[in-house]
Amino acid sequence: MDNAAGDQNIDNTVVAQAVAAAIDEIYDRTGQDSILVTHSQGGLPGWEVPLYTDHVAAIVAIEPGGAAAVDSDAYSAMVEQNIPVTFYYGDYIGEEFTDVPAAVMWSMMASSADTFTEAYNAAGGSSTVVHLPDEGITGNDHFMFQDLNNDVIADHIEAWIQENVTE
């Protein structure tokens, strides 16, 4: 499939529909909406999930492969459902890392999160971008949930959930 994210071996829509079906089943069993946590390229189909279910309580995007375009149907669905969104980025994001190609790419992805967040908040939504070093949490790479301080990151995400997700 060739799309805005490049040539991939996955169909983001198929993945989004499968995740939405799982979320709906969880809702049917528990009566609770789900918090969708995505990572990296898994962020791309994650943005589409609200097109297929209205049971997403929040989206936590950990260094996603870009944010939803503000002119997309996925973005509109998130705005309509008032889904709180947060983005998490570890170290090695920013202009000081221009000599590292992967860091340049992730800095561009973080920039798309800033664009999304500005538009989403202006549309009445709630979105934040968390750069862990700005929070005093350092030593994290793209797989921050595997880093030695993953408990600190989990606590930070949990605090965001407690503050932003209502039951």
Question: For the regions a protein language model found, what residue spans apply to each?
Answer:
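Active-site signature of alpha/beta-hydrolase-fold catalytic machinery across serine-
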Residues: E48-Y52
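Cap/lid segment of the alpha/beta-hydrolase catalytic domain
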Residues: M1-T13
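The feature captures the conserved acid-bearing segment of alpha/beta-hydrolase catalytic domains
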Residues: P64-L132
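Conserved alpha/beta-hydrolase fold motif
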Residues: L36-V37, I59
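Catalytic active-site module of serine/aspartate enzymes centered on a nucleophile-bearing elbow/loop
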Residues: A123, I137-G139, F143-E167
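Conserved acidic catalytic loop of the alpha/beta-hydrolase fold
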Residues: A16-S34, W160
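Gly/Ala-rich beta-loop-alpha elbow adjacent to hydrolase catalytic centers
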Residues: V37-G46
